Each structure stands twice: as C-alpha cells, then as structure tokens.
Amino acid sequence: MAARLALRGGPGAAGQRPWLLLAPLLLVPLLARPAEALVEGLYCGTRDCYEVLGVSRSASKAEIARAYRQLARRYHPDRYRPEPGDGPGGAPPSAEAFLLVATAYETLKDEETRKDYDYMLDHPEEYYSHYYHYYSRRLAPKVDVRVVILVSVCAISMFQYFSWWNSYNKAISYLATVPKYRIQATEIAKEQGLLKKAKEKGKNKKSKEEIRDEEENIIKNIIKSKIDIKGGYQKPQVRDLLLFQVILAPVHLCSYIAWYCRWIYNFNIKGKEYGEEERLYIIRKSMKMSQSQFDSLEDHQKEMFLKRELWIKENYEVYKQEQEEELKKKLANDPRWKRYRRWMKNEGPGRLTFVDD
C-alpha cells in the first residue's frame, strides 16, 4: 500500500498538477464568449444594441420603434440638455448618445440585419464571418439593380426616339431643297389648292415670312407623304426602340428558332429550291449588310442581284471582284485621289525621329 502511495505521489503526479491548475484558465475564454461577441466597429460596437434601446431580444418591431422615438426625442442634439450621469445605458451625455441610439435602431429595425446581429451574439467565435456579413450589407447597393436597368433602358429609348426624329426631319428638309422633289411637291400642292389656301389665310393677317414658312411646311408634308425614306434616316418606328426590342426579344427569339428550323428542313433536308425571299437573304448576308441597309437599295439593284444569281457563291465572288476593279478605276480617275497619291509619292506622311539636330 505504501508503495502504491509512493507511486501516486511521484514525479508523474507532479507533472500532471500544472495541467489541473490550467484547466480553469482554459474555461475562461469559453465563459467570456458573450462579451467577446461585441466587437468595436460592428453594429453598436462594444455596446449591446438591445441594451442601448432598453428592450429585450424578443421585442417586436413596434416596441423597438417606440423605444427609439423616446430616446431620439430625449437625446436629439437640438433638444438635449446635459445632466450628470445621463445617457442611454449609462453612456456619456453627448451627441454620441444620439448616434448610438440611431445605430441601434438601424440595426434592429431591419429583419435581415437583426438576424445577423443575433447570430453574432450567439456565435461570437465566427469572427471573420461577422465582418463579412456586416460590410457586405453596408456596401451593397441600396437601389434595386432591376430598377437601374429599367431606367437606363427607358432613357436610352427616349434618346433614340428624339435622335431619330431629328435625323428624319433633317432628311425631309434636305429633300425639300432638291429641285426634283421640290418641283413635284409644289405641283401636287397647287393641284390640291394648298398653296392658294395658305396665301388666302395669310392675306392682311400674316407677313410674307409667315406665308413662306407655311408654304415650306406644306411642301415638306407632301414630301413626307409621298417619299418613303429608308435606311438611317427613315421615319422612326416605336417598335425599333430599345425598350420594345427588349420586351419583344423572347418573341423574336422564338420566331428566329422556328424560321431556322424551317430553313434546315426545307433546304438542307428536303433540298427545295430557294425562293426570291431566301435568295435575297443569302445575298444580303454575303454582302454583310443589315436589313435596313439592304432595304434602302433601289429595286433595280435587287433585280440585278437576282438576275446575276448572286446567291450562288461563285457568282458572288465574280461580282465582288468586278466591284473592286470598278472602284479602283474610279479612284484612279478621281482628282482628289490623284493629288493624294502625288503627295504620298513626293512628300509622304510626316515622321517622328529622335535624332538630335
């Protein structure tokens, strides 16, 4: 028995005693975790937001709002009268008290922020996670991204609409100065008696300039009604605006898929012969022209394309080569191009040198 006691009291027992003494110290961080949950720089800092407002964690939003209004009236800088020891939860009586109350209310009034705050109080060990959630919410955009996109699309559509109308009116004003169209429009106006009516209405009431402006507007209106402008200066259509293009995008996508499937089935699988519409489509794609650009071409040009069978690749390559040769001939006979070539030959473009004089 004495031998057993001697063994228990030997050097091994002495080595274990420090660990027994350190065990209570190791429990201290575990017991101190609720205090460590309050981190400076997050939410209310080292103060508990619930204690700042004087409410419990189970308080409703109405109770939190009521407590905030009472404390805000009490500690507002315009109303606050300092008293010894005054302040929420024992805080110093200053403008910081009002900011602390406002911060506590902003933290607890939002459901998502309140959940993050409660989670921080319950899980203080997740230190970096709390920082991430806190700053991700603070730095997140306050405005819905969908609203921003919608407003941007509407603004771009409005700019498009007014810009297109401006271009269209400029084109009409230009056509009104071209003798060919102006004479035709004037004859139509005379046949309809519009110019005579304008002069009668302006008799003894309007000046010559006003009568001239009215006649000019009549000619422009006739040109608008008789001439179909195509291309970039065509009359604006609401369906071409970006807003309507975005709205109708699913419809256009479904239409394109259906059209593509019909194309594959009719011409690739069944081997049908191309119709006029399909031939013009292939020609337009070969020329790398948009639909509006191709529509602006004259009808006799399209007939020439069909007559030369340009939808066939070999025929189009021959036509392309001819156009390039014709362009070279035009440039060779162009006086401006000749001057440019002489200048390049004699002087050439300026050079940048780094040689010291």
Curated annotation (Swiss-Prot):
Annotated ranges, domain J: 48-121
Alphabetical list of SMART domains matching this protein: DnaJ (SM00271)
Source taxon at top rank: Eukaryota
Keywords of this entry: Chaperone, Membrane, Transmembrane, Transmembrane helix
Transmembrane segments: 19-39, 147-167, 241-261
Membrane topology: Multi-pass membrane protein
Coiled coil: none
Signal peptide interval: none
Gene Ontology biological process terms, A to Z: protein folding
GO CC terms of this entry: membrane
InterPro entries: DnaJ_domain, DNAJC25-like, J_dom_sf
Pfam (any one): DnaJ
Subcellular location field: Membrane
Family per similarity comment: Belongs to the DNAJC25 family.
Identification of the protein by name: DnaJ homolog subfamily C member 25
Organism from which the protein derives: Mus musculus
